[in-house]
A protein has these predicted regions:
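ATP-dependent phospho-/nucleotidyl transfer catalytic cores
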Residues: 503
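Short aromatic-glycine motifs in intrinsically disordered, low-complexity regions
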Residues: 706-715
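Bacterial Sec-dependent N-terminal signal peptides
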Residues: 1-23
């Protein structure tokens, strides 16, 4: 039985605990602001979700407004990957499957909407302005101004519940299966009783996925009161010429009351309509599954059943309280605590579970599988290998192990490790071979409860398969020349060479840990081939032709802000200049020594070449720690970036949260350490931002159970003067994962002046 099921069983017994806590120990969830990241393209949403939930209920406000004019942030007018944007003012319903902090649009479907008066089926007609939004972990509420309806929503991992406060008169619950964030189309809906519908909605358009990769989300929806009227609608395709003569409803929307057969189409929906003599509450319960309608119904019955709204909300908030209590912060800075816990909240959304209550799930090959444990999905690995999985290896090792085992199951089913997997569909978004890095990093941090030999075999397959290799395009040239050229059609050949190098280093680390000395030597040597692209004239990595000549003309600045360029993915030569975390000492030598290394780093920060909103350079503020006497620059720069980009406001993220990676960066900066080198179990220090933090570790993995991080941060100093580990002076700015986890206390003395 999984952790969340156990939480559901005990939650009712402790549901009053949150409200009864003494004021001296405020509930952790009260420090979460789900609106952080809903502006500035953070791509989060304030909807209700359980930890690692497969279902979430989010307000949907990214369609055109009621006048039909284009709103500033509308889903089809630009690249918008979220169902909700804080600046928008026109709400057209509540979605039941969503993604958080991703860079491509998908899901955002199964949209419910309460209305009054005549039934309208076009969202431009029935949408409403809104006010009085409130969001907490597991809960969201809003008032619809057009109708005078208050709506509250909550969710479990696989089911959701909405509560609509209708005024007297004609009221309606709409279920729109045509509208959605995804660009995929197609749906089915059927009434199985006056109060229950079942159906499916097609999704799967993530990052230009092909039509062949579309897949269904199944659902069951129930209302708490039997309606006076019910039915479906379908908007028909518009035909011209002879075909149009045979269709009296050509291009029109037809309403079918009391229609009990299945209806199929691209723009369909259902409605429940009431005539209330007095204000009345109607509840809508929805269960989902990626396996079948039957499983969606079972998920709904097992997780919600006859429970009322308050019970469901309290169960989920109790689960969030447990999840977020892995970190205890003692500080008078309420704002920073809210920023931190909101980040931990956002990082606990994806990867999310993909299996049903009974253990069924869709395998990567399309078959139905079964697990007695957990099956996770949404592996944004190009992002998360850099810092996310290290954080969860430390704070939530069981969850990290479940993710690793899910990745190995994907390998069993598809023959390849994941790259950017979504709902058992490999999207092949971004570049590199990031799964290998995550597997090695997890193992080297002491989480070894997975089939390491299988993992090593899978890692080598992607590194050695020369033909039809979906994970490493251009692998043959890479192995022959030691780099990818601009002539073979591989995206971002410089960036991709660097990514392959980091993955090769990880494979070498794994080989060494497993006792394969020769393979360790081979892969670690291979991981240094980025040096073939180092141009001493610029002290940067530069694109090359297959014949060994430099690509010209070379503009190191080209590629910033997603500008198209020849050599790099989502960046330019400056933003990739130091992305060789496994060979920082070697890079220092290549650049001509420590002084030139620091000069080049300062060039990035002093001349606005650093991009806090994307992954390739996010470790750069910590690289000053590799040069003795320059560590203060790391402390200064991390502090500046935290203050500039992380706020307790909707625009409180530097950009797309990338399934929690940007939030993880912030949390490390506030805690005072960062995993600067993936596949190396080390951290490097910076100045913490709280006087006391207790990390409550899982004693099944970390025997000490707790690590205290102490500092005098509240006195205003941001520069490290001294560090103590368990009472002894610690003279290095680097600490291994093992030493950190075995420590009971790490104490920082901070001051106003840098220690040079």
């Amino acid at each position: 039985m999984n952790q969340f099921k156990l939480t559901l069983l005990v939650a009712l017994l402790s549901s009053l605990a949150i409200g009864q806590q003494k004021s001296s120990h405020q509930s952790v969830i009260e420090y979460v602001n789900p609106f952080i990241g809903t502006s500035n393209y953070g791509a989060t949403n304030p909807g209700a979700i359980a930890p690692r939930g497969m279902l979430s209920i989010s307000p949907f406000n990214v369609a055109f407004d009621a006048s039909g004019r284009e709103i500033p942030l509308e889903k089809d007018s630009q690249w918008l990957s979220t169902p909700y944007v804080h600046e928008n003012e026109f709400l057209t319903g509540f979605t039941h499957v969503n993604l958080s902090g991703v860079g491509c649009p998908d899901l955002g479907v199964i949209i419910s909407m309460p209305t009054t008066g005549e039934i309208k089926t076009n969202h431009l007609d029935y949408g409403s302005a809104y006010e009085n939004e409130k969001a907490e972990p597991g809960y969201y509420s809003v008032d619809l101004k057009k109708y005078g309806i208050k709506t509250e929503v909550t969710a479990t991992q696989r089911a959701g519940m909405s509560r609509f406060y209708f005024p007297a008169g004609t009221s309606n619950v709409l279920l729109n299966l045509g509208l959605g964030l995804t660009n995929e189309q197609g749906a089915m809906l059927k009434f199985v009783s006056p109060t229950e519908v079942e159906g499916l909605r097609m999704v799967g358009s993530f990052c230009y996925n092909s039509e062949e990769k579309a897949y269904p989300v199944y659902f069951v929806a129930k209302v708490s009161k039997e309606p006076q009227r019910r039915g479906i609608w379908k908007k028909h395709q518009f035909y011209e010429g002879l075909e149009a003569q045979w269709m009296g409803y050509n291009g029109e929307t037809r309403m079918k009351e009391n229609f009990s057969r299945a209806v199929v189409g691209d723009s369909i929906g259902g409605y429940f309509s009431y005539n209330f003599k007095q204000p009345t509450v109607v509840e809508l319960k929805v269960g989902i599954s990626y396996v079948s309608i039957e499983n969606a119904r079972e998920n709904l019955e097992k997780e919600i059943g006859e429970k009322n709204f308050t019970q469901v909300k309290m169960m989920t908030q109790r689960a969030w309280e447990k999840q977020l209590s892995a970190v205890e912060i003692e500080s008078d800075d309420e704002n920073k605590k809210k920023i931190f816990y909101s980040g931990l909240y956002h990082a606990s959304i994806h990867p999310n579970i993909f299996h049903d209550f009974n253990g069924d799930y869709v395998k990567s090959n399309g078959e139905i599988g079964h697990t007695e444990g957990e099956r996770y999905t949404v592996f944004s690995l190009w992002d998360t290998y850099r810092n996310y999985h290290q954080l969860f290896s430390l704070l939530y090792p069981k969850q990290q192990m479940q993710m690793v085992n899910s990745m190995l199951s994907i390998y069993d089913e598809s023959g390849w490790l994941p790259k950017w997997e979504l709902n058992s569909t490999e999207t092949f978004t971004m570049v590199g071979d990031p799964a290998a890095i995550v597997l090695a990093d997890t193992y080297l941090r002491g989480l070894t409860q997975f089939d390491a030999e299988k993992a090593f075999t899978a890692m080598k397959k992607s590194a050695e398969t020369l033909e039809d290799n979906p994970l490493r395009p251009g692998i043959k040239e890479y192995l022959e020349k030691g780099y990818l050229s601009v002539d073979r059609g591989v995206s971002g050949p410089v960036s991709t060479t660097q990514e392959y190098n980091i993955a090769d280093f990880a494979i070498g680390q794994m080989a060494e840990a497993l006792g394969y000395a020769e393979e360790a030597k081979k892969y670690k040597k291979q991981s240094l081939s980025y040096r073939n692209l180092f141009d001493k004239e610029f002290n940067l990595l530069r694109p090359k032709h297959a014949n060994g000549n430099w690509y010209s003309p070379f503009d190191p600045d080209k590629g910033a802000n997603f500008e198209k360029n020849v050599g790099y993915i989502e960046g330019n030569a400056w933003q990739y200049a130091f992305m060789v975390p496994h060979d920082m000492r070697g890079l220092i030598q290549l650049m001509g020594g420590e002084k030139k290394f620091v000069k080049q780093l300062n060039e990035i920060f002093n001349n606005q070449k650093f991009d806090m909103a994307n992954e390739p350079d996010i470790a750069y503020p910590y690289l000053f720690n590799y040069v003795k006497g320059e560590e203060w620059r790391t402390q200064k720069k991390v502090d500046e970036l935290l203050q500039k980009y992380y706020k307790n406001k909707p625009d409180g993220l530097p950009g797309n949260d990338d399934t929690g990676v940007m939030s993880a960066w912030m949390m490390y900066g506030m805690l005072g350490f960062y995993p600067v080198a993936p596949a190396q179990p080390i951290y490097t220090f910076t100045s913490p931002k709280f006087d006391k933090v207790t990390l409550n570790l899982d004693t099944d993995f970390h025997p000490n159970g707790k690590i205290e991080i102490l500092s005098n941060a509240s006195e205003g100093g941001k520069y490290i003067q001294q560090i103590w580990v368990d009472g002894k002076v610690y003279k290095s700015y680097f600490i291994t994962d093992r030493v950190l986890k075995n420590a009971r206390q790490i104490r920082f003395e901070l001051g106003e002046n840098p220690k040079k």
